[in-house]
Amino acid sequence: MANKEKLPWDLEEEILSRVPPTSLDRFKTVCKRWNALFNDKTFINNHKMTFQFVLSTRSKIYSVSVNPKVEVRELTLNNPGLKAQRHKNLFATSGLLLCDVGNGAVVWNPWLKQSRCIKLEVNEPSLDFLGIGYDNNKRVEEIVYKTLSVYMKDLGSQYTWKIHDFASDTWIDQEIEKTKYSRRITEGSVTIRLTNLSVVSLNGKFFKFCDLPSGKNRRRDALALRVFREDRFSLLRQCHVTKKIKIWVTKNKIDNRYGGDVKWMSFMEVSIPTMPDLEHPKFNSQPSYFIDDKRLVICSCDETGRAWIYVVGGNKLVSKTQLDSVVDPWPLHCTYFPSLVLVPGGQREEAELQVQFQFPYLCFSYMEAKNLHVTTELYVPGKTKSSIKLHYG
């Protein structure tokens, strides 16, 4: 018996949380409520196919989720640029991954299976991609993404910023003052010095952003800067001698003002003498991490290069899991939060027009979002199927 009625919202949300991410973006136009739901970070984080880390080896790329069980999945590499050679660097910004592949880079949204290759104007063996960002110009509605890289024009000469504009597909060079760049300590598009944080704007200028709360650090101390709750910074420091971990977060959200009004506050301290070193300078391996409420989740490599996931909470090591399926040692890794951000000018795999999901008592099938109705079939074993047509406008 067909009835024109709506399912309970919590059930509807549960069904949508099982829809493949490649179709979620298309479904934004179904109704305002769905559009608002898909823009909600809580929905994205609770999606059945979400993950928190990305690891790259010589030949494969993996996603790792911790919910709370650690699950490792191999991500498909449908872009020739991702398959061609070992990645030099791996960065994540706003749901996009930047993979430095030596002779260029690939910008990738693994959740949406979209990618785009960035080709160099000329071969620059010394060029390193450092990150991806966008102009913080509120007067422009469309976000213009840019990548930041650095290279040495000639042996012994000073470094030069190289900035790629996605919209125009053009490159801009900007020379760097010799005293303002150190290749060893650059992390993404920010540079962590011993006592302060410097940033590079996308016009190639270099600014001191703020002082760091960690004070003076030893050479083998782990020091990692990450985004906290989307609009703030967090800083992790592990003392090489005592293994003590301390985390600070910025009190207020970060804006585009370069100044000294950034205030840090102590967020977490963990003292576990048996905690392994999170940094291995020989291989330039820094930890990746995220903070979930009062739980600290870290991805790091041990002294043999094997990848591990450590979950810390309540001043104790809750669990540690070796990622056995990641075979190659010393993988690149980064924290990654999925999003529905489209890769500018990117190519997407063709999604199937109809997908079906199995629940214990529910079979949900849908067509592309261009059809403004969804048919849901409810099935209870031993009884006849019934259909409910849901109409949205």
Curated annotation (Swiss-Prot):
Coiled coil: none annotated. It comes from the Eukaryota. Kelch repeats lie at residues 151-199, 308-357. Residues 1-47 form the F-box domain. SMART domains: FBOX. Gene3D superfamilies: 1.20.1280.50. This is Putative F-box/kelch-repeat protein At1g32430.
